[in-house]
Each structure stands twice: as C-alpha cells, then as structure tokens.
Amino acid sequence: MSVKVDGMINKKSKTHSKKLDARALAEKIKKNALKQQAQEEPAKEENVAENFDTVVDPTAELKFKSFNELKLIPELLEAIQQMKFTKPTPIQSEAIPHALEGKDIIGLAQTGSGKTAAFAIPILQALWEAQAAYYGLVLAPTRELAYQIKETFDALGSSMGLRSVCIVGGMDMMDQARDLMRKPHILVATPGRIMDHLEHTKGFSLKNLKYLVMDEADRLLDMDFGPALDKILKIIPTQRTTYLFSATMTNKIAKLQRASLHNPVRVAVSNKYQTADNLVQSMMLVSDGYKNTYLIHLLNEFLGKSIIIFTRTCAHSQRTALLARILGFSAVPLHGQLTQAQRLGSLNKFKAGKANILIATDVAARGLDIPSVDIVINYDIPTDSKAYIHRVGRTARAGKSGKSISLITQYDLEMYLRIESVLGKKLPKDPSPSKAVLDTLHVHVDRASAEAIRQTKDFHEKRNPKKNRDDRDREER
C-alpha cells in the first residue's frame, strides 16, 4: 500500500504500529544539525580572522580600473584585450599591484573570481625580462583545472612566444619527459606527477625556479597531496616568489602558508557562504525509489537547457549518464574513473554544446571554466555546505541568471537542514508532478535503469587502473 505525504511516495512501515511524528522528527534533526554547525563554524571563522589582514569588499572601489594603468608590456596588454578583460575583478585589483612589486600573495577567492589571471599576468610580465626555462610552476589539485590554467597562460602569452606544458597523471611519462626537455617557461602540474618527474626524469630540475603558485590549496590538502607538497617545497629554491590561493582558510592552509610564503600580502575578497543574488535555489522532496524518475521528469521540463547534474560517486555519475542517454538525452559523464582523454572529451563536448547535460562528481564543482550553465541539479546532496556552494556556483555566473534544484530524500534531511542553516534561509520547495505522471514515467525509467546498470557493470569490468602515484591526482568522488 502506498501513501502520498507532502509530495513523497512511501510504503507504509510494517514494523511500526505508530505513525512517526514528522514535525517532531524534523525539529530534532534541525536541532542536531544546528548544534553541529555551531561547533564547526567558529573555528573556521577564527582561522580566517587570524590569517587575513586585508579583507576586501567585492563592491569596493577597485585599486585600478583598467589594465592600461599597470604599465604592462604591450604584448601582454594586447592579449588581455583579445581575451576581452574589460576591467579587473576584485581579486585581480587587489593582488596584481602587489604581485608586480614582487611580493608573496595569499588570497582567499572563490572559483570564477578571476584568480588565474591574477597570478598569470604578474608572472608573464616578469618572464618577459628573464626569458628563462622552468620559470614558474603552478600546482593544481585536478587534471582538468591544470589544463584550464595552461590555456589561460597560453592565451595571455600568445604574443610572447610562451612555452608551457601541462604535467598530470594519466598521460604517458615519456611524452611528458620529452616536453620537459624542450625547456618550457611555465609548468602547470598536479603534485604527484611533477614529483615523479623530479625523481625519475634525467636532466629535469627546478633549481632555477622563480615562481611557485599553489592554486585551490585547500583542495590540494584535502586530496592528500600534503606529502608531495612537502617534498616539492624542499627541492625548489627558497629564494622565489610564491602565490597561494584557496577558497577557504583552515589550520592546514595556515601551516602551509607559514612553510612556503615570506611576509605575504593577505587578501580575501569573497564570502565563503555566499551564493549569487541572481541564482534561484529550490529543493524537491522525493522518494528514494523514485529518484531517477524525478530526475528524468526535470530533464524533460528543462529540455534543451544547459544542465550540470552532480552525483556523489563515480558509479552514480556513469550510471546516470547512461540512463539519460538510453532515454534520448544528450548527456556525458565526468568523474575520476574515466581516462584523461575521456574526461577531456566529455568536458569539451559539454562546453561546445554537443552535449547539453554533464553528469559529474565534485570534480566539476570548482575551478573549471564552464560558461553558460542554465541549471544545476543536485542528484545526490553534497555531504558538506562548502561543496553545495561550489556546486550551485556553476550557474548564475557573470551576471547571468541561473537555477539550482536539490533532490532531497528522507535520508538527506539532516544535511539539507545544515545547508539551509549556513545559507541563512529556507529553500523553497518545488511542486512534485502528479502520482499519475510519476507512475507512467517510472515504468520507462525503471526499464532504462536496468539497462544502465548492466552497461555500468560492463564499464567497470573493462577498467584496469594502475595503482601508482599517477592516480594520486584522482578527482574527489
């Protein structure tokens, strides 16, 4: 027997003779969530207050309003104009003048803030005079972000004869060694793979390195790159300029700052828990057994829109992408169990509009330049509030409007309430489709789900991953 409760379809429990008091349960969950949040947040806020001397209001007057004011070389200004950088972002306005003076920088800035150009422009300006090999090393937590950073350097250095290389896991070591022997100016790398080359590639050394950048340092540490970072810091020269950028400030980041930077200028230009004003956020209560059905219903509702669907695991990403394809949607997966070529293929198809649905783990939540995303759907709600902020931040960018929808089951209520607490507001509930619509759609979805599960099993059986340091630059699942 089924009953419909507030948009959710559930089977009556046979093991409980009394009805649960839903309101009391919700209040208990909320109380526990708020208590836990209160215990966690003061420490985080204290870290930010302690480690950041300069907190900049993003709406404050910019230190410079045009890149022409910076006395950059003509070749760099030409590239900036070609990239249509009309005015600096707040992080660029704060960081670039100090960086051009040769100071170390530590910046608290979110994805999409323009921080890549904030460190690339000063490095390229200095490189013009030096023209030295292995001049700058940029460390990134993920392969996709590393490739994206390289693209920015290449675009800004297009008139300078810049040589850059991307050194990440999942690619052939010998090919990369040959690239390194061509004496590139800029290296963009994941820590595990660049450490492999420092240890095993004959003739490769960073003894003359002048610039070190650690981008998204919080993720570098979250993904267990700490030991590799320690080794790299011991190998490279102490007389260098260092930039450290992070979305959040923690004790680990503060420790890394003390170990790697010298009298840095500290700048924060973002609110950790801020979402864009032009982002419409909502949730939809769903039955766990009907989750795929609700998702396909939403894809039908937003047919033709550019959509990112976030899942918690690689398996969910792969299976959900297959499900969507079987039902006629143009969807591609993006997760850490794909090869590097497959991941770049999925990303490029989505960015080019050849596929309008990207189904990803949190690898796509930060750092990647994915323009014009209309809708973000949290198929699996994230396990922490920061991840939620980063996910929904993939839409409503550059002044455009956007929408995010989170599918919430009865098992997600505690985490959902914690997210609402951090946001400081309740998310409106979207209406559910009628039971008749769901039941009709569920028949087709159920059949397609069985086929998607079979194909996912085949995908995993064909995989034969190498278990070495190459895989330490895997993505968050």
Curated annotation (Swiss-Prot):
The keyword rRNA processing applies. Keywords: ATP-binding, Helicase, Hydrolase, Nucleotide-binding, Nucleus, Ribosome biogenesis, RNA-binding, rRNA processing. Signal peptide: none annotated. One of its GO terms (biological process) is maturation of SSU-rRNA from tricistronic rRNA transcript (SSU-rRNA, 5.8S rRNA, LSU-rRNA). Residues 96-267 form the Helicase ATP-binding domain. It catalyses: ATP + H2O = ADP + phosphate + H(+). A motif (DEAD box) lies at residues 215-218. One of its GO terms (molecular function) is ATP hydrolysis activity. Gene3D superfamilies: P-loop containing nucleotide triphosphate hydrolases. The Q motif is unique to and characteristic of the DEAD box family of RNA helicases and controls ATP binding and hydrolysis. ATP-dependent rRNA helicase required for pre-ribosomal RNA processing. Involved in the maturation of the 35S-pre-rRNA and to its cleavage to mature 18S rRNA. This is ATP-dependent rRNA helicase RRP3.
